[in-house]
Structure formats: C-alpha cells, structure tokens
C-alpha cells in the first residue's frame, strides 16, 4: 500500500499485516536442499556453520544434543585405534550435522596406526568416488588420499552426498525461542515498561503542557523507570486523558507460552524425556519415574544410535566401535 502523506491533520493511519504464507506454496529454506557442484567437490545443501550456531541458540537443543553425546561416550568401549576423546568428537559431529568423518593414519609400512575424527563442518565430498577435501576460509584446500576417509551420514530423501541432522525440523522453533528471550532482554534493558497508549482529548492542556507530558513519558524509559506521572488539568473532562496498556501483561503471557511450546517441539525432535534434561514439571504429578524413563530411552533411542555409529566397523573390517550395555550404575573412569 502507498505510504500515507505526512502532516495530514486529523487523518487516521492504518496498515495491515501480510496474509499467512503456507509452507508448501513458498520457496523457503528447504527448497534449496541440493548439493551444488563446486569444481572438485560438492557444497553442503545447508550452511554447516549456521547449524553449529543454531545449537547454541537454545538451551534445550544444546543440552539435548550434549546429553546424547554423553550417553554414547559413556557406553563406548575404548579401542587402541580410537580413544574416548576422539569418539566424543565423532559422536558430536554426527548428532549436530547428521554426518561425521573418520580418517586413517597409516604408517610408512602400511600399518594402521590410529583413527582420528575430521571436523564435519569443514569437510567436503569430492566429485570422484572416495575423494574428500578439507575446506577452511583463508586456507588452501586439503585433499585426502583416496580411501583414507570414511563418511558416516544420516540418510536423506533429497540427496545422497551429505547427511542432515534429525533435528533440522525444529530450527524455526529454536530460533523463535531465542528471539523471545532476546526480546525479553531488550524489554528489561531498555526499560520499555511504559507500554501503553496515552489517549488525550481534553482541550484544556496548552501546547507547552502537552510537550512537558510528552517529555515526561519519554524519560520514563531506560534506567530508573517505573516513575509515577502527575497530570494536573483543571476543569478537564472525565475521559479527556485515558491510559490504555498494551504490552506488559500480554508480553509476559506470550513469552511464557512461546518458551513452553518451542521447548516441547525441541524435546519431541530429540526424543528425550524431559526429566532426563532436568526440566521442572509444572503439574503436581510430575513426569514419573526417571529410572523408568532412562531405561526406555536407552532401549528405544540410544541403542539405534549405537548401531548407526557401529557401521564404521564395516569400512574398517574389524570391531573398533563397540558399546557396553547401558545401566544406571556409575561407570568407572
């Protein structure tokens, strides 16, 4: 709509928000999930640095991924070729990016000395089979020897080159949760607690009085807010000065609701019971037995994760990645 002309006396300006946009009718982020061929290697279908930053935007997402990593490391049986530290990096990359890379360190005699994880954020798959590159900003590409790198990836329905994380569907929920928190921080930092419309129809105040009132309202924001305002209007009308609050109570309710709904979305995507992440129940009955929840989660979620991580053994030709049975007894260091 055309912009309203400025300075029109007595004019009421209105505007409308855009119509809701259906996901299936728009070209959004996931419409571009294809791998662009960049000469010698393929580019990932989504920015990997963005995925890494997204995990730190929400406490439930970051805590849930860390919890899964910790449970995998807890049950992992160290091997002479792969220690717990290296496996921890491998598991974290797989959970965050939906893919992980493991490289072989070969001696001059051809003997396998060690397996070391390669950071998935900087790895690129080559155009030719078995080719992998490490790409970092400001540095030359490093090409690995053919067959020396193994890629463990989540299956995807759009392409077969890179993996995508299971939690990709809740990126919007995680960012909405962050936006709500940032809005609340700005709300308190800026002192925007004078959230109201001051509707004045009283003809009694003079121009100077209106300017003084406007200045007093402007000074009520920022540090030292919650000031009381005094208005004296002799012979004024009963409804000549009306205060219509619009933000404080509504903003609190929306903030709480957004935090709760987005948290539930993230927990559903990660498939972790809330009591395992230390979430305080809001109902009197609670979440039930945490021991039962941990046992069921280990059977339904941890065991399939362990099976996918153990697929590396098929590439190695020996049992390097193995896991101990899950139990609730502390594991000796």
Task: Specify the residue positions occupied by each region the protein language model found.
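Extended, charged amphipathic alpha-helical segments
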Residues: 1-8, 12, 71, 140-273, ...
